[in-house]
Amino acid sequence: MATKSVTSWANLLQDSLLFIHKNNGLNSISSWRRCLGRGVFMLFACFLLGHSANAQNFRMLRDVKVNETVLDLSQSDCKVIPRNAMHSCHRLTSLTLPPKLDSIGTQAFFACDGISGKLYFPATTRVVDASAFNGCCQLTELSFDGSTRIGAFAFANCRGLREVRLSAVVPPVCADNAFDGIDLSRVKLIVPAQAKKAYRNAPGWRNFFSRHEMENVCDPENLLVPRPLKLEVYKKSLPLKWKDVVGVEAPQELSNEKMQAERILAERTVYKKGRKTGPMVRLVLDKSLTNDEAYTLQVNDKGVTIKGRTATAVFYGLMTLEQLCIGNGVSSRSVKIPALNIVDEPRTAIRELMVDPVRHFIPFEDLKGFIVEMARYKFNALHLHLVDDQAWRIEIKKYPELVEKGSDRVGMDDMPEHISGYYTQDQMRELVRFAAQYHVMVIPEIELPGHEVAAVHCFPQLSCAKKPVPIRLTCGVSNELLCPAEPFVYEFLDNVLTELADVFPAPYVHLGGDEAGQPPLGAWSDCAACTALKKKEGYTENWQLQQYLFDRVINKLHSLRKTPMYWYEQEFKTIQPGCVVYAWRHGLTKTAIDAAVRNKAKIMLCPGEHCYLDYPQQKGDMPEKNWGMPVTTLEQTYRLDPAWGQDSVFVRDNLLGVSGTLWSECINSAERIYYQAFPRAAALAEAGWSVPERRSYKEFLTRVRPLTDDMQRRGVAVNVR
């Protein structure tokens, strides 16, 4: 950059900005790619990130994928790098911080695991906040010229780190867990000679000389999410010391749960193999319990006993035990837990999270990781949104074109990255087996009659127009609907559903059903075949055609012994027997509930104002690109009432469960899925599990804090504001 004069750079920047402006502004991806070479990109970054740089500015660099691997801010006047600035930007390999930097926000460079080499923090740097560089595993050197305060987990899991150099004579404030997840015996700490003793005794820095583990205190009343039905702590009784524990005892039917218990002992406690006698962790099947998911958990100095009617119930007891081991979250290993007794069972039958690999593909291994995390909070269903306008993501052997042509595209709104990928049936069978180890069922979703552009792209005869259409590159609602008068539609759906039923053993298949055009179902009004079908059947309205389509598909699912699910819309005038509807639209939950009660149907609650976890958790939070999304705060999610004010008869006869949705128009990395989900998913889990009398938002904030600390320690993204 030094080889050009300031004037020539300014002229080049002016020409570039003018070109962008004439080509639809900053969101014109082709403009970015045509006019921004590396040098101009650097200058553009400096222009964009001036004194008033904000999250939206950084989003332009993070998510609008100019194919740059270097972020050089050495010429920038930027003083504040905000929270999440380049969150999970895996393409970055090099970072140079601005010379007048004041602060780096929470998770600003979280999981930027490509950044390598040395990072220099100028003397002006006042703060590096929580998890700012957590997971930057290729960083090797850190150099601080000033007295920079270093927040919790700021450099956790930077496992490639080999040298940390500081100029400050007085040790800067540093969280004791700032460098968690690193073997500090391999890291050289270089400080002024006269300050070595001070650093040796200073929190955070002392860990470079010898590990100082704070004792993990377990206070059960201030732990546990979801909150159990009954909890008694016996403070006058002797606690269980993990160093005394011998091992795990369980019948053959609980072999999977025994492995989970052994994992908890190995990862979460100071237990060591080798003792011959002492306390045991005992897992017991107890058929006297009346609820299949009910468990009891007893702890005393003689050991741990978890009883459940089923293996699932015992597993939930183990997830509670694991949270007890996390304790107050200051250490990765538990020394002891107090004597206690827990009696627990869920309020609702299904606690579900939905992920959307269509808009942004989710790699297979990342789906597995998400299952492990959601199971910690006793979620028991992963809802996979496999089909939409933007892609078809599941192999259908009868129609290989669906993934050959329908799983690849370039772009999602203003994010121009190449997005491709699909799941084979063998992968999904493996996922089902993996999820079963965590007592999570996998529910597949296709779409009809709308959100089917990818299918119509592959098979134009599915639509009324019978014309080829491109895969959609934007969010929103398309008028390309499946044609209810087309015989091939039913042949196609029969074959797709038959294959899905064979791959996914869960008793449910989700059929979509939402947002079928603008106006809803309007595309059928101009279709001669649909008009003829109306006349033949004596119909006068398009909603009757939708009923006709769904009746046939639902009958097919019933023949496959599957329960149909779909998103409730007002165009559904009746709900077919044996179906499950989802209340999702803002302001229409009561309407959906009334329809479910009237039709004796089951209902899942996922109203957007509480359960749309892809919405930002607070104003200005990710995703900063906002096409009308409201904020869904942690408190809003927590305050979801699954009964929606209805009586106990509704809870008994109609309420099936709760669901949190993670639509991925703006979620373009696995880390961002976790960030959007947690801790709101934990709040939703408590809404679906715990009875109202045991719920308190204020107390939840206390109870969830150790769990979010634990996630950061493990390098899992979580919204910690």
Predicted regions and their residues:
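Feature activates predominantly on carbohydrate-active enzymes
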Residues: T290-E491, N495-Y508, W524, R552, ...
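Bacterial Sec-dependent N-terminal signal peptides
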Residues: M1-N57, C218
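Acidic, contiguous N-terminal accessory segments
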Residues: F179, E215-A349, L560-E571, R705-R721
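Structural signature of tandem-repeat unit edges
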Residues: K65-V80, H90-S103, D113-V127, C137-R149, ...
